[in-house]
């Protein structure tokens, strides 16, 4: 039945019914951390740290020292250190420079093919798939990776640039609690980091663009716990991702599952037929089935 006709005959309930009628298929959001989840290391370790003449362990220790010494944000501390060390090394930090470093970022097995594979599976089931990044890494570096175009929105740290195009100040700093705000933005279909007005407006659950039960969150560590917990608590699914070659990461994933922070854990292998592939496809099947049952229950 056409949405306008339903609008006419349904009286006080016309708004919600019309919206549901327009939703011929559910939208499923795959929301992923980046470092340790899609990539085997921190993105700064694939070119930038080497360019400033340091070793990864040395860089991160100096960043931690700033945070501890100043009782400051770990995120802002690493962003400041990038500024300071780049200046010492005579490296300009323009958006295109960050993107260039991003081209060297390594990805886990199957990641490059993952998006097309899952998109096609969703399409075959009558489900629209959307991919999002929710990371404490740098948006500009992620934009330089070969998978950047796969994401509807990259929520991550970023810089403010001067008239010469050089980074001069942190624009967005995303720590483990700040990550949670982006779940609610995705929930309401808000893509702007700056927009707080729409994010704080009350909105009925049945008109939100992507309900939490239609979210799948991927993360590798304890900094993802708030997001994992929120998605799981509101009916979505959280997957603890681990590098199968890293015993520490395996133990972290097992701990997350044991503490009921996640629904599933899986090695960071995104190839066809992998455990990750099986879990995600099965979740998509369930979301589609629940969507159809809800429509039947509302007699549409």
Regions found by a protein language model. Give the residues of each.
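Alpha-helical substrate-recognition element adjacent to the catalytic core
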Residues: 5-163, 256, 262
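C-terminal cap/substrate-recognition subdomain and adjoining C-terminal extension
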Residues: 106-132, 136-300
